[in-house]
Amino acid sequence: MESDITLLHEWLTSRQITTKEQWMDEIASTLAGRVSEQIFFGHLSTGALNDLERVTKQVYAMVAYYGMSEKVGTISYYDSTGQSDMAFTKPYSERTAQQIDDEVKAIIAEAYAMAERTINENREGLTELAELLLEREVVFTEDVERILGPREPKQESAPETETTETAEV
């Protein structure tokens, strides 16, 4: 049985380059089911366990491996050698561990708030979509676009800076 560290390593190394903004959107999307339970039903269930586990691992990776935290800093505590699988020590102090934990909680709270805003802004349409799904058991892209509007186009990355050629002397 593979350890969680090995599985996380496989997940991290199989990913393509992702920006912090893309990860925040992905995390908010993952939390949307739990947020929806709270907004629409007024309670939480155990149904989001897998989502919470994935989000927690992803945010710890953002903070402790990819240096995507201003508070913790641009530093990586990731050990690509695999040596940490055998040792039960962290390559940082308890104070840093607490900073990492605090930052992870703050980032998850921020993504949760993003999901809440999005769901609340689209509550009427989501209710209509849910009713349609209960009625027909399937909805199509056209239904979603009619109810919620067309999907926003993906943001293009910034254009590369043009280079000027110099004449050979």
Predicted regions and their residues:
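Soluble catalytic regions of large protease machineries
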Residues: 1-169
